[in-house]
Amino acid sequence: MAGKWHLGHHAPFLPPRHGFDESFGIPYSNDMWPHHPEAKPGTYPPLPLIEDGRITDAEVTPAEQEQLTTRLTERAVRFIERHKERPFFFYLAHPQPHVPLFVSEKFKGKSGRGLYADVMMELDWSVGQVLGALERHGLTRDTLVIFTSDNGPWLSYGDHAGSARPHREGKGTAWEGGTRVACLMRWPGRLPAGATSDQYVMTIDLLPTLAGLIGAPAPTRKIDGRDVWPILAGQPGATTPHEGYGNWYAQNELQAVVSGNGEWKLVLPHRYRTLGGRPGGTGGIPAKYETVTLEKPALYRLSTDRAETTDVAAQHPEVVARLQAFAEKCRAELGDSLTKRQGSGVREPGRIEGAPTKKKAKSG
């Protein structure tokens, strides 16, 4: 893999310990480093560059950030060239366009529409380089390419962020603007070109789907994803294997549940951040969010109202009851800090063996 890992920066949590033979990139995101415009002195340690579990550059500088998209792309292309004779899996997780933004000289100012657009042009170039490498080595028809994202835009950054329109809100919320992202797949001969699907799937479904395609045994531990290949392949009559999906955020808050087919979404009472219609910031400095409270559950029919403008809970009490029951199943297994539920299936967080633990202060 190459790019942003963001699943822990100590050795037990790095890619070599989690199935990757090769890895190169940064352990967390761009805003978690001393060079962020709003970072206070001492808030973050230096951002290192790590290769195969070893630090090769203790402090990535802004100048090096400008070259990172190019370097990650080159890694992906070289990996394809070296492994063209055997099956492979490569995960390319570009840090951009996460703020703060950086772009190489070859794309700086090229879009004519600002830094964010320049960054997107460079990422478009990167995708083209990877697809070109597959084409050169005759691998196009043998390779499933998946292009997707982890969340919606960070709206407070304004001209250094994207747009979630027509969806509501953005990153850091359970509204569609925060959770619904693009997913494009290419596999000539297996996936029809130009086809679209309105079926609802989640990133958690990728692992079991890919495992099923290559005939790999299912993981022995319990996972929440399901094999959704029949849906992706457009097989007639294919339906979701999920009863529904849960959207947790913050300190394990179950903020919304969605029916398995994506028809209905019940947003549960919680506090969330919003710009309240105000514009985002400029030049990499974010605008301030305000916090509002959703006092009662709100139901939206996503098939006709993806913008979540009209609460139809009063018109469909039976749907509300069904999704509330599903939410209770979610809480029973994975907990919910909003309702102070622990959850029978909650695992302990990863810890470093021998690391000191925080002691609670004595009262009195």
List each model region and its residues:
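A structural signal for well-ordered alpha-helical segments within the folded catalytic domains
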Residues: 18, 70-74, 121-128, 201-208, ...
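Histidine-centered active-site microenvironments of extracellular/periplasmic hydrolases
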Residues: 10-19, 99-103, 109-119, 132-190, ...
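Loop/turn elements at helix/coil->beta-strand transitions in domains of secreted/extracellular proteins
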Residues: 19-21, 84-90, 139-145, 180, ...
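C-terminal cap/loop subdomain of S1 sulfatases and analogous C-terminal strand-loop tails that border
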Residues: 21-32, 40, 153-165, 169-176, ...
